[in-house]
């Protein structure tokens, strides 16, 4: 009888729940099962659910830049994995607990900030809140992939070698934090606080001066302002890009027939309503 309440406590408890039935084994099993599930998802073939995903998988769109050229929204993180793959590196910037006051007391969740980039012109930032740290990090990585933007790089002086810095001064703002990126000569390195330094390095910028003002201790806003500044490198045209624009068809327009023929749900049964008498 002494052991009778244990299952109820184990099932309903928060701290000791589930771990009550074999504490060490339960914890290890949970971790292992999580990893195994992730591995299965990795091995599973990607089945795209958006038109853009279908065009990417069928190799109709061959580069990420084609997507950015037409400002097509990316709704599947597998598209980023398809193009950038192993080149992508992610880093957890911060995990912070956040609380909400409820009738029952305080509900604590964990907020994760994750930066992602290929160190060669692509960078993203993801923020996710969840009950568990691992879930928050996983969600933040997915959101970071969906927010990947191209980075335009330029020169400080003469155009010798590969572009190494930002093309000109750019500014990003989030909350009270304002971040300014200033071109720097080759060999300077990234002169900045640790948070922008990680994002700029992941974006593939080798040399850069930075200036920040506002409440930079708020890491989330500091990271978002830096991300906005990096994204702003493609928001203007410099005189060397004042060429006449040649308009081309969007991939959706170009491959309309292909999408309708191969992937349309109503492609097999054409006009089923015509056969039914009313």
From Swiss-Prot:
Question: Which residue ranges are recorded for the region named Disordered?
Answer: 1-43
**What processes does the entry annotate via GO biological process terms?**
translation
**Which Pfam families does the annotation name?**
Ribosomal_S5, Ribosomal_S5_C
Which InterPro entries does this one have? Ribosomal_Su5_D2-typ_SF, Ribosomal_uS5, Ribosomal_uS5_C, Ribosomal_uS5_euk/arc, Ribosomal_uS5_N, Ribosomal_uS5_N_CS, Ribsml_uS5_D2-typ_fold_subgr
| Gly residues bias locations | 9-21
Q: Where is the S5 DRBM domain?
A: 88-151
Q: Give the protein's recorded name.
A: Small ribosomal subunit protein uS5
């Amino acid at each position: 009888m002494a052991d009778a309440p244990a299952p109820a406590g184990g099932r309903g408890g928060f701290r000791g729940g589930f771990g009550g039935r074999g504490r060490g084994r339960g914890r290890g099993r949970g971790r292992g099962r999580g990893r195994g599930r992730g591995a299965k998802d990795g091995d599973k073939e990607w089945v795209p659910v958006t038109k853009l995903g279908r065009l990417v998988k069928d190799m109709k769109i061959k580069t990420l830049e084609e997507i950015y050229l037409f400002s097509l929204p990316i709704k599947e993180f597998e598209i980023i994995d398809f193009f950038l793959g192993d080149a992508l590196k992610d880093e957890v910037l911060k995990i912070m607990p956040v609380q909400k006051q409820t009738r029952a007391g305080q509900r604590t969740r964990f907020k994760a900030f994750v930066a992602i980039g290929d160190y060669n012109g692509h960078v993203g930032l993801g923020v996710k809140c969840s009950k568990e740290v691992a879930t928050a990090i996983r969600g933040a990585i997915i959101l970071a992939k969906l927010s990947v933007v191209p980075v335009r790089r330029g020169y400080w002086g003469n155009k010798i070698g590969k572009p190494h810095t930002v093309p000109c001064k750019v500014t990003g703002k989030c909350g009270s934090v304002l971040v300014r990126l200033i071109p720097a000569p080759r060999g300077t390195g990234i002169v900045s606080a640790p948070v922008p330094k990680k994002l700029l390095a992941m974006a593939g910028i080798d040399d850069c001066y930075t200036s920040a003002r506002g409440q930079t201790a708020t890491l989330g806003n500091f990271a978002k302002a830096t991300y906005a500044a990096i994204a702003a490198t493609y928001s203007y045209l410099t005189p060397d890009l004042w060429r006449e624009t040649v308009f081309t068809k969007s991939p959706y327009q170009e491959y309309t027939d292909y999408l309708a023929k191969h992937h349309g749900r109503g492609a097999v049964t054409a006009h089923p309503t015509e056969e039914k008498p009313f």
